[in-house]
């Protein structure tokens, strides 16, 4: 998916001076990209004006957002809300074309098969990370849309069953 990936602004394009206490544009940070999905913590914002300067890093609801580090490769879907969102420099986004289900890609990216590709090619020692260029090269099987939807439905069904089993064991 080479032409569908975008990285966050270079660090110097989103500095502390660009942050605001006004709840204008939510900055998606590593702490928001959880193993189990979106984490609504560590809220930071920038201005609508600054968003216009880094507009290619804007994230829309349903876009796939991938952490570049700690651990590299985990992914979430941007939440559906009235807020505007922008990537931090530690994340990338995939804007998917028609015919590709964002939940299917999310599950594929969060799979051990994809993560192994990421971990085999990370760089750094203390801050292990990947890059958009590397993420663009990893393989994800993309079946026809009907099969993608069927896979997503089955995965959701199985996770629901696991949640019910977990709750019954805690009771």
Residue ranges and their predicted role:
Residues 43-47:
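Short glycine-enriched, charge-decorated loop/helix-capping segments at active-site entrances
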Residues 1-11, 141-171:
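Non-catalytic DNA-recognition/assembly elements of restriction-modification systems
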Residues 1-36, 52-54, 123, 127:
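Low-complexity, Lys/Gly-biased intrinsically disordered segments
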Residues 29-30, 48-110:
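A short beta-sheet element
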């Amino acid at each position: 998916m080479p032409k569908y990936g975008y990285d966050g602004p270079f660090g110097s394009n989103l500095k502390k001076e660009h942050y605001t206490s006004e709840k204008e544009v939510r900055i998606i940070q590593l702490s928001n990209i959880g193993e189990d999905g979106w984490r609504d913590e560590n809220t930071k914002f920038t201005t609508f004006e600054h968003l216009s300067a880094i507009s290619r890093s804007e994230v829309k609801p349903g876009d796939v957002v991938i952490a570049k580090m700690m651990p590299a490769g985990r992914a979430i879907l941007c939440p559906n809300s009235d807020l505007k969102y922008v990537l931090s420099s530690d994340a990338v986004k995939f804007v998917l074309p028609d015919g590709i289900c964002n939940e299917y890609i999310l599950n594929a990216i969060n799979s051990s098969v994809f993560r192994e590709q990421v971990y085999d090619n990370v760089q750094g020692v203390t801050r292990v990370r990947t890059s958009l260029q590397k993420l663009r090269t990893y393989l994800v099987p993309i079946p026809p849309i009907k099969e993608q939807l069927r896979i997503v439905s089955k995965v959701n069904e199985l996770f629901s069953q696991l949640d019910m089993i977990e709750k019954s064991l805690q009771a």
